[in-house]
Design a protein with these regions (language model features):
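Domain-length accessory/inserted modules outside core catalytic folds
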Residues: 1-30, 37-148
Length: 148
């Protein structure tokens, strides 16, 4: 496995966000990437799950819109605040774009909760490729998201 500590840290952020209900598809502040950046930069959330005191800049580089199938990518916007936010995660903007697309484009399911869970499973699939995880590690990672 490539960079286990980085993988474990990312997984912990996503599990905590999911179990604490601070993970929201379609919200750049609180999606999978938004949570990773917020945790990395110690950004707090308000009651509407918006960042306090920081603008969302990373979505100027890439974003997956609900009404479009293709992801919008603007690599020329990878500067300033957007660069700082993306770099804080330890992933490249291309890797984060893959995670974000997987999260937002996951199968809907019957409920919002099921859609969120499907999104997280899709992110774990992307992380397993980035970190070159074996099947056993991937299955164990997915099991962390089961709510009791």
């Amino acid at each position: 496995m490539k960079n286990k500590e980085h993988f474990d840290r990312t997984l912990k952020i996503l599990v905590n966000a999911y179990l604490n209900n601070s993970l929201v598809q379609g919200n750049c502040h609180a999606c999978a990437v938004g949570n990773m950046i917020a945790a990395s930069l110690d950004i707090k959330y308000d009651q509407d799950l918006k960042w306090i005191g920081r603008p969302v800049a990373w979505s100027q580089v890439f974003v997956t819109l609900n009404y479009k199938i293709a992801q919008v990518k603007r690599p020329w916007a990878y500067t300033g605040e957007a660069r700082e936010q993306i770099n804080s995660t330890g992933y490249s903007w291309q890797e984060l774009a893959r995670m974000e697309y997987a999260f937002e484009r996951a199968p809907r399911g019957k409920t919002k909760e099921e859609h969120m869970f499907n999104g997280l499973m899709a992110v774990v699939e992307v992380l397993s490729q980035i970190h070159e995880m074996d099947e056993k590690t991937k299955v164990a990672a997915k099991e962390l998201f089961f709510k009791i």
